[in-house]
Amino acid sequence: MRKFAYCKVVLATSLVWVLLDMFLLLYFSECNKCEEKQERGLPAGDVLELVQKPHEGPGEMGKPVVIPKEDQEKMKEMFKINQFNLMASEMIALNRSLPDVRLEGCKTKVYPDNLPTTSVVIVFHNEAWSTLLRTVHSVINRSPRHMIEEIVLVDDASERDFLKRPLESYVKKLKVPVHVIRMEQRSGLIRARLKGAAVSRGQVITFLDAHCECTAGWLEPLLARIKHDRRTVVCPIIDVISDDTFEYMAGSDMTYGGFNWKLNFRWYPVPQREMDRRKGDRTLPVRTPTMAGGLFSIDRDYFQEIGTYDAGMDIWGGENLEISFRIWQCGGTLEIVTCSHVGHVFRKATPYTFPGGTGQIINKNNRRLAEVWMDEFKNFFYIISPGVTKVDYGDISSRLGLRRKLQCKPFSWYLENIYPDSQIPRHYFSLGEIRNVETNQCLDNMARKENEKVGIFNCHGMGGNQVFSYTANKEIRTDDLCLDVSKLNGPVTMLKCHHLKGNQLWEYDPVKLTLQHVNSNQCLDKATEEDSQVPSIRDCTGSRSQQWLLRNVTLPEIF
């Protein structure tokens, strides 16, 4: 009898599981039908229907989405809306699975239980429903609940209806408090973030862009660094989400933030000195001279103490370098935490328009940061970008007062101690155009890349591509590239500056006006008939075609 009773229990249990499986199968089948009927970009049904999709669906584990050939034209049209593959994004679950891309040593790290709480501030303007909500769900699903104080969504005057009441209704159902704050008029990223920070309540503010995906274990290492030192500002490794396929690709832990001559943020290899400081342990945070600006965490009170953002800046652009300089020069630390990974959709073009034009806004913002933080080195930037000096940059007295109040260090200290491998040469003999006496043409990098030939073109006096520096190391430099000659008669190419002299060593004679390549013993010459857009290098003759005028060659060295 006992055996028979036992069998009945087993059969009954099995029947329950079979019925449950059938119910779930029917449930998700109906859910998928609902999604097929819903308006593009808008959810249908309740939260469970929206979020739960089988994990073998499109884009799961970060795999690329393939659009069928018959939908390619529609895909291209939809792409224009947000400048990423909106069709692919809408095919992917809002809580899609992602690979764990952390270093193995990161996966076993143990963090304190009493980490500070954070408010996650996300600014959006006409963002796609799928990318915005995927950002929100990734924060909720991959963060310890007790560490998330709230999520603050700041709407920078979006015009799309589904980002109004439907969004507010949706986020009310989530298990984490989500507040939607509306800007009364288009204000830009900087002021919208300031609004979000002002209403936040967490001990830490974490800023994210509206098209991100957080991965497993992303938050704890960020908060742990701030708990260790509240003056530490931390960024995750920014992984790449393809704007074409939404494939998730791990970012490198061997790059950090810098900037070029035009004050554009750039990624550069982590230098050996930083590897030595960490004793080769790649799981330790990297001290970075600058941050990309889209994703970072900062102690809420410290954010106020160091002056938040410069509210005199407009929309977007330059604010990331401004806050980076300020953090370092005023006693803080800026790190990339290599055990934290957050994906970001990198677009090739922006879908947004800016009042007054993008260039005018960025010039104003860069002028403000240069005037407040770069001391005498601002003149280097102005020679590169003379148009910046023509913009009205507003009143900076409060920012200069902040610098005095915080007793911040000079920019020369920053270059020497934080960013000694900066592309700005600290010692140089000339900066500006290099003009050929005979042809009246100037050297021009033509916006070409490494390993390409340097160009020569009519002088335009607008800086930019025609600015070269003859450095104290006797290099002819354009940003991080130096003129290099590896064989007799050229060509003259642009290679990464290595500071080892050799093929990048040039001797300028201020009397003869010649630029002699020391290794080949030949002189820089005008272009030839065979190639009229590149300078040549030939045996030195002293002819006018080998004479060059270096702009500002009498400038004293900057120390």
UniProtKB/Swiss-Prot annotation:
Changing N465A: Little or no effect. Induces a slight decrease in activity. Its EC number is 2.4.1.41. Pathway: Protein modification; protein glycosylation. One of its GO terms (cellular component) is perinuclear region of cytoplasm. Keywords: Disulfide bond, Glycoprotein, Glycosyltransferase, Golgi apparatus, Lectin, Manganese, Membrane, Metal-binding, Secreted, Signal-anchor, Transferase, Transmembrane, Transmembrane helix. This is Polypeptide N-acetylgalactosaminyltransferase 1. Residues 285-347 are annotated as: Catalytic subdomain B. Its cofactor is Mn(2+). It is an enzyme of class 2 (transferase). Mn(2+) binds at D209, H211, H344. Residues 29-559 are lumenal. Changing E127Q: Loss of enzyme activity. It catalyses: L-seryl-[protein] + UDP-N-acetyl-alpha-D-galactosamine = a 3-O-[N-acetyl-alpha-D-galactosaminyl]-L-seryl-[protein] + UDP + H(+); L-threonyl-[protein] + UDP-N-acetyl-alpha-D-galactosamine = a 3-O-[N-acetyl-alpha-D-galactosaminyl]-L-threonyl-[protein] + UDP + H(+). Catalyzes the initial reaction in O-linked oligosaccharide biosynthesis, the transfer of an N-acetyl-D-galactosamine residue to a serine or threonine residue on the protein receptor. Has a broad spectrum of substrates such as apomucin-, MUC5AC-, MUC1- and MUC2-derived peptides. It comes from the Eukaryota. There are two conserved domains in the glycosyltransferase region: the N-terminal domain (domain A, also called GT1 motif), which is probably involved in manganese coordination and substrate binding and the C-terminal domain (domain B, also called Gal/GalNAc-T motif), which is probably involved in catalytic reaction and UDP-Gal binding. One of its GO terms (biological process) is protein O-linked glycosylation via threonine. Residues 1-9 are cytoplasmic. One of its GO terms (molecular function) is carbohydrate binding. Changing E322Q: Loss of enzyme activity. Residues 429-551 form the Ricin B-type lectin domain. Belongs to the glycosyltransferase 2 family. GalNAc-T subfamily. Disulfide bonds join C106-C339, C330-C408, C442-C459, C482-C497, C523-C540. PROSITE patterns: RICIN_B_LECTIN. It comes from Mus musculus (Mouse). Substrate binds at D156, R186, W316, R347, Y352.
